[in-house]
Amino acid sequence: MDRWVKDISGKSLFLTNLDKLFWPQEGLTKAHLIKYYSDIAPFLLPYIHNRPLVLKRYPDGIEGEAFYQKECPDYAPGWVETFPVHHAERVINYIICNDLATLLWLANQACIEMHATNICQEGVIT
């Protein structure tokens, strides 16, 4: 199973490269990561609700090069929510992950780490 299309609450989610090894020594794949995030979603989503995320992506697995991403990519599905944060030189449209579809889309983007910022759509969290 290398590709899969799933409908989550009316949102079409295209999952790809599911057999790609993310943890080679353990034999764990992207499909394992997606299932993990699906399993923990009820516990994780309340903590990152309405918070802009800084993502750490590992496109070649945990042993490959990783990079941080703040800006929502142009190719993101239209249903992925963003929140503009004004910085000195530009505006960054951070991803907001409030639902399972977005969480699994992030996992499909090889986003192993998600770091919630200390701001939310309503303002600064105190």
Whereabouts are the PLM-identified features?
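Active-site loop/lid in soluble adenylation, ligation, and acyl-transfer enzymes
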Residues: 2-7, 11-125
